[in-house]
């Protein structure tokens, strides 16, 4: 077992870029990153990625391993200040809950979807939003508001929206890119405009943009958010797997 570079870690995780998307994004976007690997036969057989997410001073730990023998030493090596553990492989759950005192985070379960093709609706018109739209976005009752929009552009994210009467009434963003995937996120529709297929339209357009740039489109929804899951399925996404998040007591 040894420390590995982010580049080594990325190459190992690339064997399953959809299943490992959260680990790959942690390597690219998080802070105070620690990577520990288990070597077998001269190659990595398991990996621990612990990092600070935005707005959280504690580390979040995630594991990927070929089998239980590779996972066991990574559990021992988990940093004591990793107070949050996210599990994306169901077979790891017993070993992790046995090794650590864990409390499930409320509403923490997420469903990951992926797609390689989408069907674009004929209407409404959805277009890429640019800095020229900043005033309209700021004047609209969006989830992110003007500052969130500018922050998204500064990070290289690609927002798409439906506009009417100089107001933004629906949007989604292509964000959190890895070399293989990109996520459709921040899906929002103005309350008075819901039930008209706008969410499906912005999700489909955003996913199509991701696919045109030769990445797999990812969509993440809370297990309890059935409406969001229906949008994903209607757009053409297929359920891939679930993740569970825990707070670590010891």
List the predicted regions and their residue ranges.
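A conserved beta-strand-loop-helix scaffold within acyl/acetyltransferase catalytic domains
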Residues: 148-159, 163-190
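Conserved active-site alpha-helix within GNAT-family acetyltransferase domains
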Residues: 90-104, 200, 223-241
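Conserved donor-binding loop and adjoining core beta-sheet/short helix segment
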Residues: 4, 14-78, 172-182, 190-191
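Conserved hydrophobic beta-strand within the GNAT/NAT acetyltransferase core sheet
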Residues: 184, 217-221
């Amino acid at each position: 077992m040894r420390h590995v570079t982010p580049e080594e870690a990325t190459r190992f995780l690339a064997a399953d870029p959809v299943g490992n998307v959260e680990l790959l994004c942690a390597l690219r976007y998080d802070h105070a990153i620690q990577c520990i690997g288990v070597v077998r036969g001269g190659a990595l057989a398991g990996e621990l990625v612990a990092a600070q997410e935005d707005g959280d001073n504690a580390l979040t730990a995630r594991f990927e391993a070929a089998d239980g023998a590779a996972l066991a030493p990574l559990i021992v090596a988990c940093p004591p200040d990793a107070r949050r553990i996210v599990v994306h492989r169901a077979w790891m759950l017993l070993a992790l809950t046995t090794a650590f005192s864990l409390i499930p985070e409320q509403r923490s379960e997420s469903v990951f979807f992926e797609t390689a093709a989408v069907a674009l609706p004929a209407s409404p018109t959805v277009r890429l939003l640019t800095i020229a739209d900043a005033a309209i976005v700021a004047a609209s009752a969006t989830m992110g508001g003007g500052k969130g929009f500018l922050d998204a552009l500064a990070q290289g994210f690609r927002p798409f929206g439906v506009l009417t009467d100089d107001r933004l009434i629906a949007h989604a963003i292509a964000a959190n890119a890895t070399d293989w995937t990109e996520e459709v996120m921040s899906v929002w529709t103005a309350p008075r405009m819901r039930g008209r297929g706008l969410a499906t339209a912005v999700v489909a357009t955003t996913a199509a943009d991701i696919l045109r740039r030769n990445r797999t489109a990812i969509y993440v929804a809370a297990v309890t958010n059935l409406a969001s899951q229906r949008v994903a399925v209607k757009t053409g996404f297929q359920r891939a797997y679930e993740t569970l998040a825990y707070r670590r007591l010891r």
